[in-house]
Amino acid sequence: MESSKQKRCRSSVVETIEAPLPLVWSILRSFDKPQAYQRFVKSCTMRSGGGGGKGGEGKGSVRDVTLVSGFPADFSTERLEELDDESHVMVVSIIGGNHRLVNYKSKTKVVASPEDMAKKTVVVESYVVDVPEGTSEEDTIFFVDNIIRYNLTSLAKLTKKMMK
């Protein structure tokens, strides 16, 4: 952990996806397959645990993620802190890698949309992260929010394709 004097920031990104909750959750909860919808992820190798896959225990699983070239990092090591299939909550922490997202922790919550509970899903991804030295809180939030927004847009496209 960094010094308690380290500046931290937090934000949330909300995306409504035109797909039923069970489909959206089945993709999001697959800790061992982030590349299914996270387009900056080139590959994922499970270091420990089952990643929440069928028959595998999820909580405490650790994955090594290789990122695509051109991204401002090469790899990330991440731990699944919580995976709750009843409340549709997933918590992930970044515990290593060659990036600037120190002490990053995200919580993703999935709920059926009040507009159309059978056909729409609302995904809320909230996070907290240290503000890297030499960077502003606003720039950090802008960067992370855009990655999350891109991933959730990709998730929406994937679910739409799967429903055809």
Swiss-Prot record:
Binding sites annotated in the UniProt record for abscisate: A73, D74, F75, S76, T77, E78, R100, L101, V102, N103, Y104, K105, S106, E125
An example molecular function term from Gene Ontology annotations: signaling receptor activity
GO CC entries: cytoplasm; nucleus; plasma membrane
Coiled-coil regions listed: none
GO biological process: abscisic acid-activated signaling pathway
Location(s), subcellular: Cytoplasm; Nucleus; Cell membrane
Swiss-Prot/TrEMBL keywords: Abscisic acid signaling pathway, Cell membrane, Cytoplasm, Membrane, Nucleus, Protein phosphatase inhibitor, Receptor
Residues at the site labelled Involved in interactions with PP2Cs: P72, S136
Placement of sequence motif Latch loop: 99-101
Region START-like, residue ranges: 3-160
Membrane listed as a keyword: yes
Residues the UniProt record annotates as site (Involved in ABA binding): V144
Short motif (Gate loop): ranges: 69-73
Broad class of the protein's primary localization: cytoplasm
Quaternary structure, from the entry: Forms heterodimer with PYL10, thus antagonizing PP2Cs-binding and ABA-independent inhibition of PP2Cs. Homodimer. Binds ABA on one subunit only. Binds to CARs protein in an ABA-independent manner, both at the plasma membrane and in the nucleus. Interacts with PP2Cs such as PP2CA, ABI1, HAB1 and HAB2.
Similarity section: Belongs to the PYR/PYL/RCAR abscisic acid intracellular receptor family.
Record's comment describing the protein's domains: Upon interaction with ABA, the 'latch' and 'gate' loops change in conformation leading to a tight dimerization and the creation a surface that enables the receptor to dock into and inhibit the PP2C active site.
Function: Receptor for abscisic acid (ABA) required for ABA-mediated responses such as stomatal closure and germination inhibition. Inhibits the activity of group-A protein phosphatases type 2C (PP2Cs), selectively PP2CA, in an ABA-independent manner.
Name of this chain's protein: Abscisic acid receptor PYL13
Native species: Arabidopsis thaliana
